């Protein structure tokens, strides 16, 4: 009996010793992992991502089931443009701990940066289901939704962010972008006005504000916004063209001519400026001045109704009837649903002696006008009480 008790005591002592060794080994391993964490994070703060990668791999040699280490390894790989390996690391982290937000967030953010907007939505939504207050994830989700043309959902996400940060310039610009893509111009005007009241208003922002005002049928104010945009960036043909176009739209032809001439001085081959200025001259009866400009526009945009139509009219007025008919035919071919195209082509054909075809085109013009009038009458009838 005494021998049995002695043997049992020996076994227990051995077990206790082994447990103590195991506990001490685990404690030592944890201390080593903690030290490596600090080293890796120090490399990250210094932007030394290749060294950070090496340390995170060492951590994973010690603790292969450390989801946070896999997440951080993915970040280090991503910063070195090792995208495929980074995604693999984040997926490993997700497999180990599906309730950890970090790998979902980094995966979604990486997809947004590479313009894979639809694919980014799911991991970012998963991030927010785990961390509802993760502002970075919500911003990235808003971008992904805009990139996927899911504008109403994007607007809801941006609204939540703006509720917390109403003077955040980036969020206001993002909201404006979403509203503009939805043609919600009045709301775009409001958020852009708020953005312009903050520091750092750029020419681009003033131009975008002008576009929103014009979309909201506030064209005189839009022209003023574009004038400020031009003041901030006078060498931009794009911004100056926007101002010239708005002046043209407001029948301020002298102002429009001045701006459009300046656009063409900056960029002699700008087809939009050439078309608008050419159309302006055509409207003023200056056919010869309009022709070279409209030629430039028609060459640049051969499949547009407006460019071929305007050139056709100018050629007819200048006496080049054959080319005029050809251009008007091309315009109608580009869009045969515009009554004035058929009308002008019909008149041109009659002028060159093609009476039968000319009358057919005039009949098509009348039929389209009748269809338009009937549609307007029906819309009016539906509005009646």
Each model region followed by its residue ranges:
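Structural signature of tandem alpha-helical TPR/SEL1-like repeats
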Residues: 45-58, 79-92, 113-126, 147-160, ...
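Structural marker of alpha-solenoid helical repeat scaffolds
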Residues: 62, 96, 130, 163-165, ...
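Alpha-helical segment of the N-proximal tetratricopeptide repeat
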Residues: 31-62, 75, 79, 177, ...
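TPR-adjacent "capping" and linker segments in tetratricopeptide-repeat scaffold/adaptor proteins
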Residues: 21-35, 196-197, 372, 382-384
């Amino acid at each position: 009996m005494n021998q049995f008790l002695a043997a049992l005591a020996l076994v227990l002592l051995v077990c206790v010793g082994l447990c103590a060794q195991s506990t001490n080994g685990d404690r030592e391993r944890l201390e080593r992992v903690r030290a490596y964490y600090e080293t890796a994070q120090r490399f990250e703060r210094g932007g030394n991502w290749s060294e950070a990668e090496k340390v995170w791999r060492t951590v994973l040699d010690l603790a292969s089931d450390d989801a946070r280490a896999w997440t951080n390894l993915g970040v280090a790989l991503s910063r070195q443009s090792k995208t495929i390996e980074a995604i693999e690391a984040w997926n490993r982290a997700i497999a180990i701990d599906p309730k950890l937000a970090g790998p979902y967030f980094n995966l979604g953010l990486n997809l947004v940066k590479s313009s894979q907007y639809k694919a980014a939505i799911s991991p970012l939504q998963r991030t927010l289901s785990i961390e509802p207050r993760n502002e970075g994830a919500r911003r990235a989700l808003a971008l992904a939704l805009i990139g996927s043309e899911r504008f109403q959902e994007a607007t809801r996400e941006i609204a939540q962010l703006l509720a917390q940060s109403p003077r955040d310039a980036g969020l206001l610009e993002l909201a404006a972008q979403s509203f503009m893509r939805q043609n919600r111009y009045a709301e775009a005007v409001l958020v852009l006005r708020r953005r312009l009241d903050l520091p750092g208003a750029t020419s681009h922002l003033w131009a975008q504000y002008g576009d929103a005002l014009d979309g909201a049928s506030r064209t005189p104010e839009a022209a003023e916004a574009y004038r400020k945009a031009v003041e901030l960036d006078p060498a931009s043909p794009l911004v100056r063209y926007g101002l010239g176009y708005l002046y043209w739209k407001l029948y301020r032809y002298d102002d429009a001519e001045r701006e459009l001439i300046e656009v063409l001085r900056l960029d002699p081959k700008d087809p939009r400026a050439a078309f608008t200025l050419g159309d302006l001259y055509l409207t003023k009866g200056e056919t010869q001045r309009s022709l070279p400009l409209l030629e430039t526009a028609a060459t640049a945009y051969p499949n547009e109704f407006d460019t071929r139509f305007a050139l056709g009219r100018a050629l007819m007025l200048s006496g080049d009837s054959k080319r005029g008919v050809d251009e008007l035919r091309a315009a109608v071919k580009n869009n045969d649903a515009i009554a004035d195209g058929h009308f002008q082509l019909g008149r041109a054909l009659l002028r060159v002696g093609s009476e039968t075809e000319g009358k057919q085109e005039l009949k098509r013009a009348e039929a389209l006008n009748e269809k338009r009038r009937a549609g307007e009458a029906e819309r009016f009838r539906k509005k009646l009480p």
